[in-house]
Amino acid sequence: MNIGRKIHWVFFLGGIADILILDVVTKVLVVRGIIGEFTFIKGFFYITTFRKNDGIAFGIDLPMWLQIVGSLAILLLLLKIGFEYFFGRQQVSLFEHWLFGAVIGGGLGNLIDRVLHGYVVDFIVLRPFPVFNIADIGITVGLVVLFGTMWLSSRETKT
């Protein structure tokens, strides 16, 4: 494996580690009450006591076994597609590898919660969205920015 390929792996694994560590640490701090309620913008953006989210995205309720199997299937599918795309092309930036890792790290963070607790710990409120956590930020922001960078780079190659 050449040095260029190794750097891409470092960024990918770094994205996983960054989001996963932040997610696990913040959830532990919130659950233990070390981080209490904190307001950034009153009634709009704040940290709350933790909420047990026993559903999936946007509170959709499914049996726990289906949530775990579904989460694993989605993670494996993302890994398969991601590896084919990111590690099979020459023109993928380090930032894109980090973003891909952030998405996977977020998925792992929520999967760990489901397996260990039977629910996901949520604690960040940003109205009008449902309560969420760091893993959700890694997944959502990671995907949006990743698709944006992919779209921009595809436009650049066409011109």
Question: Which residue ranges define each predicted feature?
Answer:
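Alpha-helical transmembrane bundles and membrane-interface segments of multipass inner-membrane proteins
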Residues: M1-T159
